[in-house]
Amino acid sequence: MSENFRQQDTSVISPQAVPVQPEYPNAYGDEEINCIALKQRLEQFQLWLAAAFNAGSSAESLVAARSDFIDRLLRRLWVFYGFEDIPETALVAVGGYGRGELHPLSDIDVLVLSQRRLNEQQSQRVGEFITLLWDLKLEVGHSVRTLEECLLEGLADLTVATNLIESRMICGDVALFLQMQKHIFSDGFWPSPQFFHAKVVEQQERHQRYHGTSYNLEPDIKSSPGGLRDIHTLLWVARRHFGATSLDEMVGFGFLTQAERNELNECQSFLWRIRFALHLVLPRYDNRLLFDRQLNVAQLLRYEGEGNEPVERMMKDFYRMTRRVGELNHMLLQLFDEAILALDATEKPRPLNDDFQLRGDLIDLRDETLFIRQPESIMRMFYLMVRNREIKGIYSTTVRQLRHARRHLKQPLCTIPEARELFMAILRHPGAVSRALVPMHRHSVLWAYMPQWGKIVGQMQFDLFHAYTVDEHTIRVLQKLESFADAETRPRHPLCVELYPRLPNPELLLLAALFHDIAKGRGGDHSILGAQDVLEFAEVHGLNSREAQLVAWLVRCHLLMSVTAQRRDIQDPTVIQQFSAEVQSETRLRYLVCLTVADICATNETLWNSWKQSLLRELYFATEKQLRRGMQNSPDLRERVRHHRLQALALLRMDNIDEEALHRIWSRCRADYFLRHSPNQLAWHARHLLAHDSTKPLVLVSRQATRGGTEIFIWSPDRPYLFAAVAGEMDRRNLSVHDAQIFTNRDGMAMDTFIVLEPDGSPLAQDRHTAIRHALLQAITQREYQPPRVRRPSSKLRHFSVPTEVSFLPTHTDRRSYLELTALDQPGLLARVGEVFADLNLSLHGARISTIGERVEDLFILADSDRRALNPETRRKLEQRLTEALNPNDKM
């Protein structure tokens, strides 16, 4: 892994002549100590930093150069303001500045240390000193404390204590600074075990804020797991316990090998380079690699490629580096734990077998050469971990030996017959994911086992849809699948919790999950390529033909159910028949729905909501019914209409309604209306229409969730641009439209149903119902259509480009056309689409709206003015008009 990085790193740097560094501040005369002159000097220095970086200077040298420059500036100002005349006072660098690490926008944290409180005149002088630094636009954090205050505040606050531990003298009273150092490194100031525990807890809390992974697609270079803070934590703990001030000194104390020191240096160098570049493209301090910055940073680092390739290559390097930092951090903190807290020497390790023993609840090697001599023993260890619930992790020295052996493997572990048997045995065991596959991934053993896995480690996709890298997403799919075996998951995923225990071979589902995205980033259809990979894997791992074909089908079709449920008209019997023909059996259907739900949930935590759950349940049960009925037997649509009407009538009779009036309303409705609404929906509409003047518009907002969302029913004289007006108003109200059923009865009255959600995926808040109902009523009663005011897209969306694509799906009818639209998500999109339909005199009969990150992938069911499918010329015009209306290059 490290060799691959070094090759990439050298290829992106093209050294030029490094410019001469500007004059140091210690040479400035008194006449230059003013805000204007100093600001010019600082600007020159910042320009030099950027030029030197572009010319190939290392981030390490430039970070040190800025720290040195600021040191000299502060010393010059210290003299200028006469602080040398104040006895027993010192200026001390703390934080990152204390470590001598100042990136272009890093804060400059200083401590004005004194033996006793400063008097009013001295305090005023300090204030003038700090004010000048602020006027120079330096981000200065400062504190003014006596020695006693430093110690008291340090004892009370871990952050203050950490700053003091890495403090560095700039100028002033050296004896006072050394006195402070003596106190903070004494046994009474944050004893080593206490400091260690506090820093570990602090790190755990920080990791939790980032969902426990560095694989978020907009990571914080400093604070995300595996980032620079994880290296700092190691340095802080070593500094407090051993007095070590560098990684080199940690090697001297025997708690870091030369190879580990080199690896941490390599990781830090890479992270510094990215952070330095980020600071050069930002106007103010920030360490987050947000989407809108990633391309600029990648270009500054000279990553090459078409489109998003530079970003994806840079981020792949980044994620691989943070993986390595994370593994080293975890292992070394364990080693510190052993050194600092010293496990009870009287507690002897308990043998598990000839090769492994248990130290507390951690598995440990009995012979440190075992992994090198017998690589298959690596798999034996993970097999023991999945079988023995006492084992909670791997002992630190064993992790060290595992890392060493991993780097010396001559061939993938899957080429060893015993390793293959053990891998399949692991998959078949309950708890395989949490107790074996997750730690195997954490320690890069999955990569060592199957080379294909290495290709997706750190593989990101530059979009707003996928929240994690491909490997992290896959691990989360596996974890979600395993959770379906837990009854506690039932409230969130009732169908999957019911089906998962009924799967005859759940290990096949885990195998499909492992391979479902394995071919991403290779080019071509990743589903087909992944299916080919898993067939080869199945053959060498001894799966029979039936098992191999099932897993390959799941990989090839892992998107089928999601696409069908969210982007097809699943109330159309033909769609259900086509889907059922592909699925073929109830067993395959059960496997597929579990994989689909896990895949959606693991793609982005915000994607799963009650709407998607209802769609998948509806598709599952409709398919199950079709499979049980037999593929040759189509549902009787007339019988379904009759059944829906009778059930709705039964509900309405409980309200003593006027059945003659009801018959008059229903007699004017076409069959599609009854087919596409449930009896409860039909009764709800009728109940309000019977109590309403049917010549006037009506807007209803359901109080109960319908298919996971809020149903809005609109009754209004049909007219051009009605859909556009409704969609525009919903957009103004920040409603997310997910489904629309558009009907016009025989009297020309529109009977339109919309399923809407709040932006967070929840049903519409009750306190918004009245305002939205009134707003929609006003929108549909306006005499002339008023196009919605064009709003700017969100800042995130502005950095993505999605070409507008229009296609027409094959259809079984000559009465409807099915249009599939892909475009950049943008404010007012549905209203603009509706305007185009109205301009071309097309009638909309239904819509299924899917927003996938920055993309919309929508389905519209259309007919022309003669209630027929669109002819080729109309299709051509429609495609042209939609492309013009939605082209992301248009000004908005």
Curated annotation (Swiss-Prot):
Residues 470-592 form the HD domain. Uridylyltransferase (UTase) activity is inhibited by glutamine, while glutamine activates uridylyl-removing (UR) activity. Disulfide bonds: none annotated. PANTHER family: BIFUNCTIONAL URIDYLYLTRANSFERASE/URIDYLYL-REMOVING ENZYME (PTHR47320), BIFUNCTIONAL URIDYLYLTRANSFERASE_URIDYLYL-REMOVING ENZYME (PTHR47320:SF1). Modifies, by uridylylation and deuridylylation, the PII regulatory proteins (GlnB and homologs), in response to the nitrogen status of the cell that GlnD senses through the glutamine level. Under low glutamine levels, catalyzes the conversion of the PII proteins and UTP to PII-UMP and PPi, while under higher glutamine levels, GlnD hydrolyzes PII-UMP to PII and UMP (deuridylylation). Thus, controls uridylylation state and activity of the PII proteins, and plays an important role in the regulation of nitrogen assimilation and metabolism. The keyword Ion transport does not apply. One of its GO terms (molecular function) is phosphoric diester hydrolase activity. This is Bifunctional uridylyltransferase/uridylyl-removing enzyme. The gene is glnD. HAMAP family: PII_uridylyl_transf (MF_00277). Residues 711-792, 818-892 form the ACT domain. It catalyses: [protein-PII]-L-tyrosine + UTP = [protein-PII]-uridylyl-L-tyrosine + diphosphate; [protein-PII]-uridylyl-L-tyrosine + H2O = [protein-PII]-L-tyrosine + UMP + H(+). SUPFAM superfamilies: ACT-like (SSF55021), HD-domain/PDEase-like (SSF109604), Nucleotidyltransferase (SSF81301), Nucleotidyltransferase substrate binding subunit/domain (SSF81593). InterPro entries: ACT-like_dom_sf, ACT_dom, HD/PDEase_dom, HD_domain, NT_sf, PII_UdlTrfase/GS_AdlTrfase, Polymerase_NTP_transf_dom, UTase/UR. Its cofactor is Mg(2+). PROSITE patterns: ACT (PS51671), HD (PS51831). Belongs to the GlnD family. GO terms for biological process: regulation of nitrogen utilization. Residues 352-710 are annotated as: Uridylyl-removing. Has four distinct domains: an N-terminal nucleotidyltransferase (NT) domain responsible for UTase activity, a central HD domain that encodes UR activity, and two C-terminal ACT domains that seem to have a role in glutamine sensing. Residues 1-351 are annotated as: Uridylyltransferase.
